[in-house]
Each structure stands twice: as structure tokens, then as C-alpha cells.
From Swiss-Prot:
Belongs to the ATPase epsilon chain family. One of its GO terms (molecular function) is ATP binding. F-type ATPases have 2 components, CF(1) - the catalytic core - and CF(0) - the membrane proton channel. CF(1) has five subunits: alpha(3), beta(3), gamma(1), delta(1), epsilon(1). CF(0) has three main subunits: a, b and c. The keyword DNA-binding does not apply. Keywords: ATP synthesis, Cell membrane, CF(1), Hydrogen ion transport, Ion transport, Membrane, Transport. It comes from the Bacteria. GO terms for cellular component: plasma membrane; proton-transporting ATP synthase complex. This is ATP synthase epsilon chain. It is found in: Cell membrane. Produces ATP from ADP in the presence of a proton gradient across the membrane. CDD domains: F1-ATPase_delta (cd12152). The keyword Metal-binding does not apply.
Length: 133
């Protein structure tokens, strides 16, 4: 099967750069599957896992939202943070989840509930992706 290059990039630099046969992402408008030769598209992403298939192997990368740019010959994902499944520190992700849950339960006026909720979603996503190794 044909392959195409995929780059997942954060402000700190590239996180994933490989040739793949298919990319699956969760866009704000729904699930997208991208194969070689896909029409050009730009879409905002949800906090989710990016699935990258090549042969019988699938890589998973946790992204904290961002955008996907699809060209017929290349796909680029831009995200504020991204981690490959095998690089996720499970202890750190569990701690982040615990802190976010605590902030949400405190219900104090100075707590930004939406930020705590987003932090919880990011931590849960990282834990889910780490289980996909």
C-alpha cells in the first residue's frame, strides 16, 4: 500500500515524523480517516489520540487539540502538546488527573472550572493513549 509522510509538531519541535499508510484523528466535526491522495483539508482537532497505521503496526500519539493540515502528499498535525504512547509518563499523567479532579471539586470562586476540565481531559487522554501501546 502507498504511504505518505506525517509530521506531528508542537511548539517544542517535532514529536512524530514517519511514513504511514493511514492517519485517523478526531476532528471537531467528527472522526477523519486519511489515506494517500486525500483532498486538501484543514480541521481543528479534539483532545484525543492520533492513530497512525503502517503495515500491521499502529502508532498512537496523544494530542491536546490543535489542527490537522492535509495535503495530497503530506499530513501535518499542529498541537500545543503531543506525546507518543510509549513516551507517556503514567505517574505524571495520574498526578495531573488527580490535581484536575481536585480543582474541579473545590468549587471555589477563584478556580477556573473550564481550565480544570480541560486539564482533566488531557490527563485522561494521555492515560488512555498510554494503554494503547
Amino acid at each position: 500500500m502507498k504511504t505518505f509522510p506525517v509530521s506531528i509538531v508542537t511548539p517544542d519541535g517535532p514529536v512524530y515524523e514517519k511514513e504511514v499508510e493511514m492517519v485517523s484523528v478526531k476532528a471537531e466535526s467528527g472522526e477523519m480517516g486519511i489515506l494517500p491522495g486525500h483532498i486538501p483539508t484543514v480541521a481543528p482537532l479534539k483532545i484525543s489520540a492520533v492513530r497512525l497505521k503502517n503495515g500491521g503496526h499502529t502508532d498512537y500519539v496523544a494530542v491536546s487539540g490543535g489542527f490537522i493540515e492535509v495535503r495530497p502528499d503530506k499530513v501535518t498535525v499542529l498541537s500545543s502538546s503531543a506525546e507518543e504512547a510509549n513516551h507517556i509518563d503514567i505517574h505524571r499523567a495520574n498526578e495531573a488527573k488527580r490535581r484536575a479532579e481536585q480543582r474541579m471539586q473545590d468549587k471555589q470562586a477563584h478556580v477556573d472550572f473550564k481550565r480544570a476540565e480541560m486539564a482533566l481531559q488531557r490527563a485522561v487522554n494521555r492515560l488512555n493513549v498510554s494503554d494503547m501501546k
